[in-house]
């Protein structure tokens, strides 16, 4: 459920998710996470995985650009994680607006403290669109954010760019490549039966 904010029509998503669950299909929700506790409580039992877009750790950014607030988004992310859903976080890096290293590190620290080092973080490049005319995110900014976040999180990825880093899934213990990615090509290269081929650590991947 994605590409428009699905929780605008939360009743529709709930109906579809229930039907999908009856057919043994997985429900994956991509959302900005701006939802109150009670409706989230009702729908989360039917959701298998979420990607939550935390746009900045600066509440002023949310109020200026999103006309909303940061706290409800963080509360939902924690609620989703505590409910047992698989949670991943995305942060769109926008030059001059939310690319400050201190703010980026605050996000990684919050994820690590509240959900653990194993929660994946996707750092995505911004592109000019509609009324937002700032220049596209430089690769250097994303790679700098990657280095900052990797101090706190084991799985950090770069999105919307071609980069030598932040593409593959690597074993946190030995550094071996578990899943290699090139564009939309994805190959399980270093894991077998749920374990790293090199060090035999159990991999943090859900296989279905």
Tell what function each PLM region has:
Residues 1-137, 145:
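Conserved AdoMet/S-adenosylmethionine-binding subsite of the radical SAM
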Residues 96-208:
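Auxiliary Fe-S-binding modules of radical SAM enzymes
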């Amino acid at each position: 459920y994605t590409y428009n904010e699905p929780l605008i029509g939360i009743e529709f998503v709930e109906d579809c998710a229930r039907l999908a669950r009856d057919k043994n299909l997985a429900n994956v929700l991509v959302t900005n996470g701006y939802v109150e506790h009670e409706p989230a409580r009702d729908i989360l039992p039917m959701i298998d995985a979420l990607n939550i877009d935390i746009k900045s750790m600066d509440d002023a950014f949310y109020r200026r650009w999103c006309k909303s607030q940061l706290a409800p988004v963080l509360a939902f992310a924690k609620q989703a994680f505590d409910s047992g859903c698989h949670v991943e976080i995305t942060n769109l890096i926008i030059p001059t607006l939310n690319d400050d290293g201190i703010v980026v590190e605050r996000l990684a620290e919050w994820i690590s403290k509240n959900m653990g080092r194993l929660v994946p973080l996707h750092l995505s490049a911004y592109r000019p669109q509609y009324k937002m005319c700032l220049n596209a995110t430089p690769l250097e900014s994303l790679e700098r954010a990657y280095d900052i976040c990797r101090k706190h999180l084991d799985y950090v990825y770069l999105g919307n760019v071609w980069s030598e880093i932040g593409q593959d899934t690597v074993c946190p213990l030995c550094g071996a490549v578990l899943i290699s990615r090139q564009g939309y090509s994805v190959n399980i290269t270093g894991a077998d039966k749920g374990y790293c081929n090199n060090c035999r650590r159990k991999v943090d991947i859900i296989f279905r």
